[in-house]
Swiss-Prot record:
Subcellular location: Nucleus, Nucleolus
Protein name: U3 small nucleolar RNA-associated protein 15 homolog
GO CC annotations on file: nucleolus; small-subunit processome
Pfam families found in the cross-reference section: UTP15_C (PF09384), WD40 (PF00400)
Organism: Xenopus laevis (African clawed frog)
Quaternary structure, from the entry: Part of the small subunit (SSU) processome, composed of more than 70 proteins and the RNA chaperone small nucleolar RNA (snoRNA) U3. May be a component of the proposed t-UTP subcomplex of the ribosomal small subunit (SSU) processome.
Amino acid sequence: MSSYKPLAIPTYPKLGEKITQDTLYWKRYKTPVQIKEFGAVTKIHFSPIQPFSYAVTSSTRIHLYGQYSQEPVKTFSRFKDTAYCGTYRGDGKLLAAGCEDSVVQLFDISGKAALRQFSGHSKAVHFVDFTSDKYRIVSGSDDYTSKLWDIPNGIEIASYKEHTDYIRCGCTSSLNNDLFATGSYDHTIKVFDGRTDKSVMSMDHGQPVESVLLFPSGGLLVSAGGRYVKVWDILKGGQLLVSLRNHHKTVTCLCLSSSGQRLLSGSLDRHVKVYSTMNYKVVHSFDYAASILSLALAPDDQMIVVGMTNGVLNIKHRKPEERKPLQSTTKRHPRYRVFVRGKDYMPKQDDIYVSKPVREHLKKYDQLLKGFHMSKALDAVLQSQIRTKKPEVTVAVMNELKRRGTLKNALAGRNEKELSDLLIFLLKHLVNPLFLPILLNVAEHIIDIYSPVVGQSSVIHKQFIRLQEVVEKEINYQEELLKILGMMDTLFATMTTKKESPWEEPKPILPLGSQ
C-alpha cells in the first residue's frame, strides 16, 4: 500500500508592488513613535542647524522637540489664543509665530518671553516666515493682507492687500532676500518683491490654496489646494508646468527632501505621497490613521514628522545603514583550517548526492483526511485562523472532498456554530473568481441540505438572506458586464473596415470606355 501524499495547496498569483530603489529607501523608516498633543497639529518646522530640533504648533502652544525626545524640551505657551505657524529662522536661534489674536510674536529659543510683538493685522495670522537675510519677517492674515516687518526696529516695512480672501500660507525665497509668495482662499498665488509696492506675478490655482513651496533654486513654485498639486515655472512668468491629482481629498501640506529630488504632499485622505521632481510621478506612499494637516522632513532626511487632525504627532526615524563587519586580520591557529575545511566546496556535476530521509509531519487536516474523517477535516480548515489568513487551504480541502465524492456528507449534520462559520466563509469568498467553481458546489449543497430548517435559527436565516443578496448582486454585475461587452463589440464592428474575403471571386477588369 502506498504512503499518503500530503494535500497539495495550489498557489495563486498575487499582485505585488514593484520593488524600486525608492520603495527600498522609504521603507527604511522605522515603526513610528506617536505623541498626543493638546489639539490638531497645524505646523511642524525643523531647525536648519544641528541637532535638528523641530517646533510643533498645536492649540495655544508651540512645543520644541529634540531629534529623539518624546517629551518637549521647551514650550512657548504665552499666546492669548490659538497659535499658528511656528517657524525657525535660518540660524535656528529665533522662532516666529502667528496667533488668532492678530499679533506676530518673535521668540528667542533660549528664553520664554517674546522678544518682539508685531501688531498691525486685524485678524488671525496663519502664515509667518523669515526672509533669507534673517532681518525681516513676512506674515499673512485673514484680513487679506500680507506684511513685511523689520526685526531690529520692530516696525512694519510694507503692506500688500491684493488678495480677496484669507491668506493661509506662504513662503520666502532662499536665494532672493526680497522675494516671497502667498497663497489665499481666493484661489490665487501671488509673488511679491519687497522693493516694490505691488505683486510681480499672480497664478490661479483654481482651488483654495492650502500650501505653497519654493524650490531652493528659486525657479519653480509648488502650490497645493483642493485635490491638486501644481508646479509653476516662475522664470517663465508663472507658466503651469504640471498638475498632479493623486489624492482623494484636500491636499494640506508640502515639503521637499534635502536634495530637492523628492516632493512630499500630505492630505486629508490620510496619505503622504512622494513624487520624483524629475517626472512628477508618485514613487512611494505612506498611510496614516487620521487626516493630515502638517508634514516636515528633517534637513538630513533622517526623520519624517506628520501632524494630524486628532492631535497625534507621528514620528518616523530612518534606520541606519547596515555596515558589513570588517574581516579580522589577526593570525589564526594552524588547526583553524581543519574546522573550516570543506566550507567552500562546490559539488561537481557527476557527484552522487545521498540525502537523509526526512520524516514529513502532516498537518492536522492531512492527518484527518488520511484517516478518512471528512467532516472533521473540513472543520479543521474552517477555524478562524486558517479561513481568514489562508483561504486557499480551506478551498483545497473542499476540492479534495469533492474529488473523493464525500463533499455533501462532510457538509451535512452541522450545528448552528459550524454552519455559521461555513456561511461566513462563503459570503466572503463566493465572488472570488479563483474559488468560484468549488464554492458554487458548496453553496448548492448547503441550500439543498439546510433549506428545510433554515428558519429555526435567526442567525442562519440572516446569513442565508445575505447569501442571496451576494448572489443577486453578482448576477447583476455580470449582466452589466455583458451589456458593456456588447456595446464594445458594436463599436469595434462599426470601426472595422470590411475586408475582401480570400475566397471571394475578383471583379473583372473592364476596358476603358466600356459600360
